[in-house]
Amino acid sequence: MKKYLIFAAATFMCLTACAQNSKKMNENKTLIAWFSWSGNTEAVVNHIAEVTGADTFRIEREKPYPEQYDPCTVDAKQEVDNNVFPAIKGLPENFGQYETVIVAVPVWWYTAPMPVRTFLEKSGLDWSGKTVIPLCTAYTAEYNTLKDIVKATPDAEHLEGLAVITTKMNGEDIDKKFPQIDAWLKKLNL
């Protein structure tokens, strides 16, 4: 009988702890809104989603960028130089349920790609009451990318962002950056 009571008490405590953890995760629902062309940002997002359980939403330009590097960079530079906000494909369902939004982007021409700016500034999404966390992948430096994401969401609160610097493309060797990413997530309590 004593063993039964100990077992029942232990089971109850485990179930209570699981329920509290589940409640905590549901209280602060997280979305990762991301854009990727070469695959680096996508690889980072996949890792973060796996570690945190966050939902993901891919920001896509309605008219896809060229698959070849040089023509893609020409299109992207023209958009930045002319402050063009290209049309994007859709918006996240139930955006209002998310308290935290990680905005993950590559650095293009010293800032976030213009489809991301469309998502942040021209989509009609309500950023008030949200916490936005900027993240970028870059070949050399983040330049103003993290600051530009913050500037584009003035009604949100913001947490410390992260720049993941890598000289590879297609997500190659991005796993070597996972310890840096994991330490950042831990610091943010995600």
List each model region and its residues.
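Short, acidic/small-residue loops that bind anionic groups at enzyme active sites
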Residues: 123-131, 136
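N-terminal beta1-alpha1-beta2 submodule of the flavodoxin-like/Rossmannoid cofactor-binding fold
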Residues: 19-103, 112, 121, 128, ...
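Bacterial Sec-dependent N-terminal signal peptides
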Residues: 1-23
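A glycine- and small-aliphatic-rich helix-loop capping segment at beta-alpha/alpha-beta transitions
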Residues: 118-125, 153
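Glycine-rich phosphate/pyrophosphate-binding loop and the adjoining helix
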Residues: 159-190
